[in-house]
Design a protein with these regions (language model features):
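An N-terminal, well-structured beta->alpha segment
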Residues: 5-103, 192-228, 240
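Short glycine-rich or small-residue beta-strand-to-loop segments that form or flank ligand, phosphate
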Residues: 85-91, 231-234, 410, 549
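Short Gly/Thr/Asp-enriched flexible loops that form oxyanion-binding sites at enzyme active sites
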Residues: 99-107, 150-157, 307-327, 363
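Glycine-rich phosphate-binding loop plus the immediately following alpha-helix
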Residues: 156-186, 327-350, 355-364, 420
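Gly/Ser/Thr-enriched, mixed-charge loops and adjacent short helices
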Residues: 33-38, 42, 151-285, 291
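Phosphate-binding and adjacent anionic-ligand microenvironments
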Residues: 292, 296-298, 320-322, 340-536, ...
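N-terminal small/polar loop signature for handling phosphorylated ligands or for N-terminal nucleophile
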Residues: 87-150, 250-310
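Conserved phosphate/anionic-ligand binding catalytic regions in large, soluble enzymes, centered on
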Residues: 38-58, 143-146, 232, 236-248, ...
Length: 575
């Protein structure tokens, strides 16, 4: 069936509601928009769905959500998981409550119990809840930090981590089999509740989650001692972090927490920001304004589903607030945990630090200094959860901390996804420790540079929308894969890791060895002088990402080298 035939069916079929038909009929004559909405089925990737909200097969709407859920239901039934049930959470985005309800009722119509949160909750609490309730799976409706027009649908398995092999491929296969809406089941909410299939969860789960967060604190006595002296500014960016972040800080004893009022309440339109991303300086404009008014020590922002944390801290020498990348804040927390656990005798002899292949190489130096294993995984926090499961099954390592450059980390194993709530808590504890020692967070970061090396990382993202964009991204990857360079700028290419082919090719001797990681469309260039760069298309957005890493003799030298490497790599890639 052509895209136009599918469009006409959606406009006329009684299965679709009148608002959907009205939205689509208004597009008559706009063939480009119709084609974009119907040229494909919104792809259910290895993590789930993500797309623009709207009518059409290539959009996030109740019909595509039901279709994906039917595929998930079929797989759960094949695994005899109906009675274990599925936990469901959602964020503050437009249509998130509706999509979560549609998912629950589709599962209920298939005889599967659901445990849906009564109102919005952070993604990591969903991960925790899957484990706590003994569910077979979990669903969270979120598009993380994407622009307001997006929403998404992420699937978790019974260990509380996002789906990984074999479940991801098996669920994908089941979703692909649902080719017609006549295959999709649903039921009335009142009937589902009466049948004991639809359950609502809330405060009791919040309390259990909060207790697990507080267990990760290493020195609550330092927090209490510095509670009156440290000033924290926080913004949830209109998302789910507001209540849990404030609660954990209050229960630990922090007294001076200032919340950005304009961004305090949940709002899927994100009226104060164009892009609710704590990686973006613009997202901090209101928070930094408040920080200057109250003379804050630390400024924090969580994204809409509260799994990523952005940070600014004051440099007392200049009086300016300095932005911390995810690598920087992650290293501060990691080094603090390792140092303090070693000091109090709780650092396990078989401890492991986990990071992604595009996260700072400073982690390697810190892990070596504290005698813990450094394990690298592909991008995506599902691989962190998978590693924790491997550790437990094999009794090999004990997870201590995990971080990724994209502003996510996890302390503890109560959840199996990145958690901005625990990241806020731990970073504020680090700040309290710094304050008790007469230094700032920025001073502590400088100390890490001086001790382990002046590591610097960067990221460039190209957005290429539509069919043409997807083809351009594929063409770029093919060219780089098939014609690897011997040099990138002044750097020699020592080795090329191609994770799609599972090969690491030594560019001098020609030796080929396996990468040891799952298949993924990622190219990683090992360069001379401890530099590196990596290229990967996004799995959820029409983007291709370029990552860079260098180490210099001081901060200025590393910044200079990073700029040179960035320019050289983008030139090579044909930017």
């Amino acid at each position: 069936m052509s895209y136009m035939d599918t469009y006409k069916k959606w406009c006329t079929d009684n299965y679709f509601d009148e608002d959907t038909k009205k939205e689509l009929l208004a597009l008559q004559g706009n063939d480009a928009e119709i084609e974009d909405r119907f040229y494909r089925q919104l792809e259910f990737g290895t993590g789930g769905l993500r797309g623009v909200i709207g009518a059409g097969t290539n959009r996030m709407n109740i019909y595509t959500v039901r279709q994906a859920t039917q595929g998930l239901a079929n797989y759960i039934i094949s695994q005899n998981g109906q009675d274990k049930g599925v936990a469901i959470a959602y964020d503050s985005r437009i249509m998130s409550p509706e999509f979560s309800d549609e998912a629950a009722l589709c599962l209920n119509a298939n005889g599967i119990k659901t445990y849906r949160f009564e109102s919005l909750r952070p993604t990591p609490e969903l991960s925790f809840s899957v484990r706590e309730l003994g569910c077979i799976a979990g669903i969270v409706i979120t598009a993380s930090h994407n622009p307001r027009e997006y929403n998404g649908y992420k699937v978790y398995w019974e260990d509380g981590a996002q789906i990984t092999p074999p479940h991801d491929k098996n669920i994908l296969a089941e979703v692909a089999k649902v080719t017609d809406f006549s295959q999709v089941k649903t039921m009335m909410k009142s009937e589902a509740e009466a049948a004991g299939l639809y359950h609502t969860i809330g405060k009791e789960m919040d309390d259990r989650y909060m207790e697990e967060l507080k267990k990760q604190s290493i020195h609550p006595e330092i927090i209490k001692a510095m509670a009156k002296d440290i000033k924290i500014v926080y913004t949830p960016l209109h998302g789910t972090g507001n209540l849990p972040v404030r609660r954990v800080l209050k229960e630990l004893g922090f007294e001076n927490v200032y919340v950005v009022k304009e961004q305090e309440l949940p709002d899927g339109n994100f009226p104060t920001v164009s892009y609710p991303n704590p990686e973006s300086p613009k997202a901090f404009e209101l928070a930094l304004k408040l920080a200057k008014e109250v003379d804050a020590d630390i400024v924090l922002a969580t994204d809409p589903d509260a799994d990523r944390l952005g940070v600014y801290a004051k440099d007392t020498k200049t009086g300016e607030y300095v932005s911390f990348t995810g690598n920087m804040s992650g290293m501060l927390i990691a080094e603090y945990i390792l140092r303090e656990k070693k000091a109090n005798g709780t650092l396990p002899a078989n401890g492991a630090l986990v990071e992604t292949i595009v996260t700072t190489d400073m982690a390697k130096a810190i892990a070596k200094a504290y005698g813990v294993k450094l394990i690298e995984v592909l991008t995506g926090f599902k691989y962190f959860g998978e590693q924790i499961k491997f550790f437990e099954q094999q009794n090999s390592y004990e997870y201590v901390f995990g971080l990724e450059e994209s502003y996510g980390c996890l302390a503890g194993t109560y959840a199996r996804d990145k958690d901005a709530c625990v990241a806020v808590m731990m970073l504020c504890e680090v700040a309290a420790w710094c304050k008790s020692n007469g230094i700032t967070l920025w001073d502590a970061m400088v100390s890490l540079y001086e001790t382990y090396g002046y590591y610097k990382e960067g990221l460039e993202t190209m957005t290429l929308k539509g069919m043409d964009g997807a083809e351009k991204i594929q063409s770029m990857m093919n060219e780089m894969r098939n014609n690897p360079p011997k040099k990138i700028g002044v750097w020699d290419v020592l080795a090329l890791r191609d994770y799609k082919k599972d090969t690491r090719t030594d560019m001098t001797g020609g030796e080929v060895t396996p990468t040891g990681l799952p298949e993924s469309n990622v190219l990683y260039y090992e360069l001379s002088n401890h530099a590196w760069c990596c290229v990967r298309p996004s799995g959820t957005e029409p983007k291709i990402k370029f990552y860079f890493g260098v180490v210099g003799t001081d901060i200025k030298d590393s910044e200079k080298k990073l700029d040179e490497l960035r320019n050289a790599m983008l030139t090579y890639a044909g930017e």
